[in-house]
A protein has these predicted regions:
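Sequence/structural signature of beta-propeller domains
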Residues: 1-237
Length: 237
């Protein structure tokens, strides 16, 4: 059953990932000047899971105009303002903290070995936030990379071997992996579906099958979506 979670904030939610070690949530915002958010629950459920009913919603702050470096987290005072305020662009969460860092169209997000990775579609970047040292860097930048084959960055997922698979929304309709050394490896490309986007990449528990969807398929319409299975195994690339 669906359930509203007011403590997680009222904003243009895109994706969420759990820091399994600290039991924190990290959230992206799909807007050109979006925030990067963290939710710290007040406690856990009896079975050790995150209690979504209450906690602190925070937004990332960086020093000056820098988009890399040490992150400071500041509390959102009013995480769930009335909907009319949001519609009138009054009291939007990312503006409640004046110096919050701005990210150009937050998209997919994933956790791996103490780090949070997320994509921003407006500038075709992949970011990496280290939860231990609370520092953020740009892992991939289409505008400066010597081999910029990855564009339209969107949904992301990690293989069990630690390679980051990035799905393209448009671009060349590819899934491209970023290995631990930062090299780009094209995994697959869908042809003849230029009006679509690749969504929801996920691995089965054995890491031998990759699943993903083409949101609008060949027809380009919402009813034309197709889901694919790719057999591996997906060992270290």
């Amino acid at each position: 059953d669906s359930k509203v979670l007011p403590a997680l904030g009222r904003f243009k939610h895109e994706a969420v990932a759990e820091d399994f070690l600290h039991k924190h949530l990290y959230l992206t915002e799909d807007t050109p000047d979006g925030g990067f958010y963290r939710f710290i629950p007040d406690g856990l459920t009896k079975d050790g899971k995150i209690n979504f009913s209450s906690g602190k919603l925070q937004i990332a702050v960086l020093n000056g105009d820098s988009q890399e470096g040490k992150v400071e987290w500041k509390n959102i005072k009013d995480p769930n303002p009335p909907i009319w305020q949001i519609l009138l662009k009054i009291n939007e969460l990312r503006y409640q903290v004046k110096d919050s860092a701005k990210f150009n169209g937050g998209e997919g997000i994933a956790y791996y070995e103490g780090k949070i990775y997320f994509a921003t579609k407006g500038d075709n970047k992949i970011w990496c936030y280290d939860t231990k040292i609370q520092n953020i860097i740009v892992l991939y930048d289409h505008s400066t990379h010597p081999n910029p084959i990855l564009s339209g960055v969107d949904n992301i997922v990690f293989s069990s071997s630690g390679d980051l698979f990035v799905a393209e929304d448009g671009g060349n309709m590819q899934i491209v992996a970023i290995d631990s050394g930062g090299s780009l490896v094209p995994i697959l490309q869908i042809m003849g579906q230029d009006e679509s986007e690749i969504t929801g990449p996920a691995f089965d528990p054995s890491n031998e099958r990759l699943y993903f969807s083409s949101q609008r398929g060949k027809s380009g319409s919402a009813s034309g979506g197709v889901t694919y299975e790719v057999k591996g195994p997906f060992i270290k690339i």
